[in-house]
Amino acid sequence: MPVITLPDGSQRHYDHAVSPMDVALDIGPGLAKACIAGRVNGELVDACDLIENDAQLSIITAKDEDGLEIIRHSCAHLLGHAIKQLWPHTKMAIGPVIDNGFYYDVDLDRTLTQEDVEALEKRMHELAEKNYDVIKKKVSWHEARETFANRGESYKVSILDENIAHDDKPGLYFHEEYVDMCRGPHVPNMRFCHHFKLMKTAGAYWRGDSNNKMLQRIYGTAWADKKALNAYLQRLEEAAKRDHRKIGKQLDLYHMQEEAPGMVFWHNDGWTIFRELEVFVRSKLKEYQYQEVKGPFMMDRVLWEKTGHWDNYKDAMFTTSSENREYCIKPMNCPGHVQIFNQGLKSYRDLPLRMAEFGSCHRNEPSGSLHGLMRVRGFTQDDAHIFCTEEQIRDEVNGCIRLVYDMYSTFGFEKIVVKLSTRPEKRIGSDEMWDRAEADLAVALEENNIPFEYQLGEGAFYGPKIEFTLYDCLDRAWQCGTVQLDFSLPSRLSASYVGEDNERKVPVMIHRAILGSMERFIGILTEEFAGFFPTWLAPVQVVIMNITDSQSDYVNELTQKLSNAGIRVKADLRNEKIGFKIREHTLRRVPYMLVCGDKEVESGKVAVRTRRGKDLGSMDVNEVIEKLQQEIRSRSLKQLEE
């Protein structure tokens, strides 16, 4: 009979099979009330599942990440329960958990309106407030199929026929008269599912195949308590205000149009930000001793066949033909960099060779996935490739890590999650080579005092990698930086150098990206700063305004002076009230507004205001220039007097 070992090491002995709920009740009524599920020997199980042998058990509650995921999954079933009550002829497809919530794909003979969604959410709340028990039943494949066939649930029947073995025992979960099928686990009672909201609807093809029927996907979010739900909804509200597409239009940074899906039309102010970002990256490339190169944006298909990209990536590549030759527009820069490396004989003394490029890349992303600057078809990669010996890997990875943190800190990103992906089952190279490579990456992270977690088996077949995910002010994750070792591509493309022993050797290649895509990173920055770009990045850094025509000459003189000092400045001499001008440039997020009246002309000074509405008073023009130059030069995130 089972001996149950709890997380604190204590044990409980039973003379019969017990469930996680039984053990929770044995510990105390409070834990039993909070029990959502159990983790038995590392595997999640329902609170009612029986444990027949000795096992390690953790009780899962709403405070656990697993508990929250189970709540969300059960809310998907709750949605199914409600929609079948409102529209009984609905056919249910799939209802998985996603980040922050869940969705359900349904086949319904009407297009859901906003009023329908509100009615559906209301019915879900009515059902959840009944606090009914969720009953689990393990049945044979044949019984499960008969159950759903009798209910007309053709999509569930299809899942059983195509995805579940005949000797398997599917789990059926009964919500009163409604039944759903799932691996589970699910909540034991609907009292855990009170804090949710339906968010939106969208179209989705059955099984993601455009040849199949279009279903309606209903998205929802769910949380353990009301406070967490409200906090999430507030974050969404703030995110909507910061949407880079909205701000990009307000600030006239760029636009997209139907004739070039996923391609960016940069306007003057947006392109100014892009070029300033390039200047910043170039300054770091120089500091960290990189060469900058430029490769062609398309190359013969034969080369992409050699690299393996054609076999594994051709659906995402644009192609064109000329004179009976097929060319691929590059989706990445690495093959071109190997071609540059291959020009001329290389010695071990030439290594490491660090090669960077602002490469114009194109990928044929599905039209439905395109999203402003965040997901495009044409983009600029800030990546680099380092050619080195095996002995140099650790030092080079160290340099990459320092560069990543150096650049991210400039923008104020402090929360960065790091993951190290290790060897997959299918891979090239010896175990000894992988041992050394993985150890080099781990030691480099440890030497920089960077906590990280392993992603076992998640590396590419050609080498392990480090991923850097930064979190913005709304705690959203953005995976931007990577350091990837490559033992394959140099060999495929015949790259070599002469070693100390005068023998030809294949270099190790390190793929390194920090911002990832320049376009996407500008989108991230736009939302991070809500359009209030730090002064060094702002398209227009200063606007100088007159109050009446009598100050026009003074304004023009100052405008020229600031421009000569390297400051991006504009004069506003319009015949408008000064309050109107200030409001307009404040909405344009211009960092500084200099106001000139008769008093300023007489004294040779300017009245300084910030876009946040702070009045810095009257200041000497040379003092303003000096302070602005210092703020811009240091790439400060703060404005004067902050």
UniProtKB/Swiss-Prot annotation:
Keywords: Acetylation, Aminoacyl-tRNA synthetase, ATP-binding, Cytoplasm, Ligase, Metal-binding, Nucleotide-binding, Protein biosynthesis, RNA-binding, tRNA-binding, Zinc. Signal peptide: none annotated. Its main location: cytoplasm. One of its GO terms (molecular function) is tRNA binding. Residues 243-534 are annotated as: Catalytic. It is an enzyme of class 6 (ligase). One of its GO terms (cellular component) is cytosol. It holds the Pfam family TGS. GO terms for biological process: threonyl-tRNA aminoacylation. Binds 1 zinc ion per subunit. Residues 1-61 form the TGS domain. Its cofactor is Zn(2+). It is found in: Cytoplasm. It comes from the Bacteria. CDD domains: TGS_ThrRS (cd01667), ThrRS_anticodon (cd00860), ThrRS_core (cd00771). The modification N6-acetyllysine is found at K286. The keyword Aminoacyl-tRNA synthetase applies. The keyword Nucleotide-binding applies. Catalyzes the attachment of threonine to tRNA(Thr) in a two-step reaction: L-threonine is first activated by ATP to form Thr-AMP and then transferred to the acceptor end of tRNA(Thr). Also edits incorrectly charged L-seryl-tRNA(Thr). Belongs to the class-II aminoacyl-tRNA synthetase family. Homodimer. NCBIfam families: thrS (TIGR00418). This is Threonine--tRNA ligase. It comes from Escherichia coli O139:H28 (strain E24377A / ETEC). The lineage of its organism: Bacteria, Pseudomonadati, Pseudomonadota, Gammaproteobacteria, Enterobacterales.
